[in-house]
């Protein structure tokens, strides 16, 4: 499987404008404080597991013992996000 293959995509909510899962990374397009946008990349080798799903937010554990939070469009999209993540890990 190519590293640019798209496994999951959601338009996100709040500051998160686009959430994508690829075979080796999670890409998030975030809206900045002053209206700008930037892409944040989290590599899957740094993710140790899913901490919890609360509503439409997904909390992931990483190696630094800090939480990565992703806000998706709906609770069902959050569950699909976790399922796609479990498929890759």
List each language-model region with its residue ranges:
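Acidic, Ser/Thr- and proline-rich intrinsically disordered linker/docking segments
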Residues: 2-15, 27-30, 34-89
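Broad, structure-driven detector of short, well-ordered beta-strand segments within folded domains
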Residues: 17-23
